[in-house]
Amino acid sequence: MATPTNNYNTIVGSPMPTATTAATTTTVTPTQKELNIEDLQLFPSILDIISRIKDDEIDLIRAINLANETRTKTIETLNKLPGINRSLENQEELLKTYKQTLKKKVELLEKLKKLEIFEKYNKIKSTSSQSPQIQSKLELQTELSQTEPSQTEPSQTEPSQTEPSQTESSQIESSQIESSQTETEKSKETTEDIMKE
């Protein structure tokens, strides 16, 4: 039986090796380089690099698991929302009915505001919400008007004092009316904006 080296040599066409040449080839072995201290100092740094890679993999796996958990919780929360299973057409129909209901309610509120009872209430409310200074002036005015008939001579100075206060009260009333009108206009504008949406 022939060895592979013998077959190779016969195929190539070289002469067959003799026993002396075979012995010389087997005795020759490459010498290995001995490890120095410098080579051994690389091991801790290599070990550190490998451990960091493992730690990064563990951290990455934890982060992926946490992201998957939050994603599933979010999907569950979204599925629990009311009306999430409605189609787009159903949602548009609901929106339309809600807008119509809102429009009817706004119209009814406007009708109620125009009733005489509520107009009187709004006037009373606006006079009660006046600042304390205006209320004190009005109280002084009523006190002066009650004391005028009992006094005879100082009546000449008092009417001059009461006249400006009367003009002040009329100005206050007109400003209150204007402010209430602007408030109603603003509320109408906001309701119209809501209806447009």
Curated annotation (Swiss-Prot):
GO CC annotations, alphabetized: core mediator complex
Sequence similarity: Belongs to the Mediator complex subunit 9 family.
Keywords of the record: Activator, Coiled coil, Nucleus, Transcription, Transcription regulation
Compositionally biased tracts (Low complexity): 145-182
Region feature Disordered, mapped onto this chain: 126-197
GO molecular function, one term: structural molecule activity
Composition bias type Polar residues, residue spans: 126-144
Subunit structure: Component of the Mediator complex.
Lineage: Eukaryota, Amoebozoa, Evosea, Eumycetozoa, Dictyostelia
Biased composition (Basic and acidic residues): 183-197
Keyword Signal: no
Superkingdom: Eukaryota
Protein task: Component of the Mediator complex, a coactivator involved in the regulated transcription of nearly all RNA polymerase II-dependent genes. Mediator functions as a bridge to convey information from gene-specific regulatory proteins to the basal RNA polymerase II transcription machinery. Mediator is recruited to promoters by direct interactions with regulatory proteins and serves as a scaffold for the assembly of a functional preinitiation complex with RNA polymerase II and the general transcription factors.
Full protein name: Putative mediator of RNA polymerase II transcription subunit 9
Location in the cell: Nucleus
GO process annotations (BP): transcription by RNA polymerase II
Coiled-coil positions: 83-117
